[in-house]
Each structure stands twice: as C-alpha cells, then as structure tokens.
C-alpha cells in the first residue's frame, strides 16, 4: 500500500510459466527456469560439435577451410555476419562448394534475433538435404545455438525444453537472456498452433491445415 493509502498492484511476472492447453501437461517455463536447464549440460566447450544429425554448431573456426573440408561441410549459416563480426561471406568460400547464408546479428539481449528464426530454419532444413551444415557465430554458444534451437522447435516439433536438452548433451551453449525470451515466445506460439490443430481434429474429425 502506498503512503497515500492506495493499494499498489503488483506487476505480473512476464516470464513465469505459461500453459497454453489445459489438457496438455506441458507449460512453457519462465526465462529463469530455462537458464537453469543449461546448468545441467555436461558437454565441454570445443570449437565444433555435431548437435543433431548433419547439423554442427561452431565458432570462428568457420574461417578454417581445412576443417570445413574435413567435416565435409556443404552449407554455412553465419549468425555473426558483417565486418564487425566474423566477416567471411559467400566470396570467402568461392573456391569451395559451400552454400552461404549470413545474418548480421549481435550477441545482445536487446537484439531481435527472432525475425530470422523462420528464414534460418528453412536454410537449415534445405541444407540437410546434402548434408552437412555448420551454424556458427563467434563463440558458438549464443546466436548460432539460438537459431539451431529455433529450427528444432519449428521443424522437429520440439518444445524449447526438448530442444535445449537435446543440444546441451553435445555442446556447451548459453544463449543470452534476451534470446531465451525470444525462444520462449516462439515456444508459446508453436504451442498455440499445436493446440489449434488438436482442436481441429477433435471438433471436425479431420486435421486442419497447419498455420
């Protein structure tokens, strides 16, 4: 209560757990709960790790063409594109059979990486037809990891918890808190879509087209 005797309304925690479907046991965790998941990872930090069949997460080792050839990398998604980051680009790999996609992202909690979630996920999915694909940034822990987590959520029907638990078994990652909040928002959006599809089956006896 304020000094004037007016009740003070407590602000809601925008990052508490959110349950979209009351018939589903799953609830999207709050941001702090998501951070705690990374403490359970056992993988040691190395330059490059295969975190999903055909998908590698790495650091600035992406400049090392010999390593790329040894790993038989055919596609590169650079989430630290640009002259102030890991400035490679398609021309850097012109002597190699590599498809390149660059995103000029910054490892800042205020940077909106979510606008690239779907375009990056589509590039990853297309790259796996070859494969192999490297997603990298400067350290291979935040930007690149966030995009791989988003891919697993969008195309492999994983929750954000499932995706994190899958990747931390194989690589030491830690997206910044802003990116975690963006993944959390994606998780809620995808949960709503799944709930809508389930309701479509229940109500009409047939599955509606996915949104």
Curated annotation (Swiss-Prot):
GO molecular function terms listed in the Swiss-Prot or TrEMBL record: MAP kinase phosphatase activity; protein serine/threonine phosphatase activity; protein tyrosine phosphatase activity; protein tyrosine/serine/threonine phosphatase activity
Superkingdom, natural source:
Eukaryota
Give the GO cellular component terms, alphabetically.
cytoplasm; nucleus
| Binding-site positions, substrate | 136-143
A single Gene Ontology biological process assigned to it is: negative regulation of MAPK cascade
Give its localization.
Cytoplasm; Nucleus
Q: Where is the Tyrosine-protein phosphatase domain?
A: 47-192
EC number(s) per UniProt? 3.1.3.16, 3.1.3.48
Which top EC class is given? hydrolase
Q: Which Pfam families match?
A: DSPc
Q: Which reaction equations make up its catalytic activity?
A: O-phospho-L-tyrosyl-[protein] + H2O = L-tyrosyl-[protein] + phosphate; O-phospho-L-seryl-[protein] + H2O = L-seryl-[protein] + phosphate; O-phospho-L-threonyl-[protein] + H2O = L-threonyl-[protein] + phosphate
UniProt keywords, alphabetically: Cytoplasm, Hydrolase, Nucleus, Protein phosphatase
Q: Which InterPro entries match?
A: Atypical_DUSP_subfamA, Dual-sp_phosphatase_cat-dom, Prot-tyrosine_phosphatase-like, Tyr_Pase_AS, Tyr_Pase_dom, TYR_PHOSPHATASE_DUAL_dom
Q: Where does the record place the catalytic residues?
A: 137
Q: What does this protein do?
A: Dual specificity phosphatase able to dephosphorylate phosphotyrosine, phosphoserine and phosphothreonine residues within the same substrate, with a preference for phosphotyrosine as a substrate. Involved in the modulation of AMPK and MAPK1/2 signaling pathways.
Q: Which family does it belong to?
A: Belongs to the protein-tyrosine phosphatase family. Non-receptor class dual specificity subfamily.
What protein name does the entry list?
Dual specificity phosphatase 29
Cite the source lineage: Eukaryota, Metazoa, Chordata, Craniata, Vertebrata
- Encoding gene per record: dusp29
């Amino acid at each position: 209560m304020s000094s004037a005797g007016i009740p003070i309304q407590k602000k809601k925690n925008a990052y508490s757990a959110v349950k979209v479907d009351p018939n589903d046991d799953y609830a999207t965790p709050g941001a702090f709960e998501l951070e705690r998941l990374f403490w359970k990872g056992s993988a040691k930090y190395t330059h490059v790790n295969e975190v999903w069949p055909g998908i590698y997460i790495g650091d600035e080792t992406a400049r090392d063409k010999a390593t790329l050839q040894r790993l038989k990398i055919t596609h590169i998604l650079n989430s630290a594109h640009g002259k102030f980051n890991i400035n490679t680009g398609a021309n850097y790999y012109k002597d190699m059979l590599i498809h390149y996609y660059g995103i000029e992202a910054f490892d800042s909690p205020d940077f909106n990486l979510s606008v690239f979630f779907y375009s990056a996920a589509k590039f990853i999915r297309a790259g796996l037809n070859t494969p192999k694909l490297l997603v990298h940034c400067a350290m291979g822990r935040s930007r690149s990891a966030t995009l791989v987590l988003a891919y697993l959520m969008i195309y492999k029907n994983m929750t954000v918890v499932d995706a994190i638990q899958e990747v931390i078994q194989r690589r030491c990652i830690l997206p910044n808190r802003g990116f975690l909040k963006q993944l959390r928002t994606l998780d809620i959006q995808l949960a709503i879509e799944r709930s809508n599809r389930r309701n479509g089956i229940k109500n009409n006896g047939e599955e509606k087209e996915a949104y």
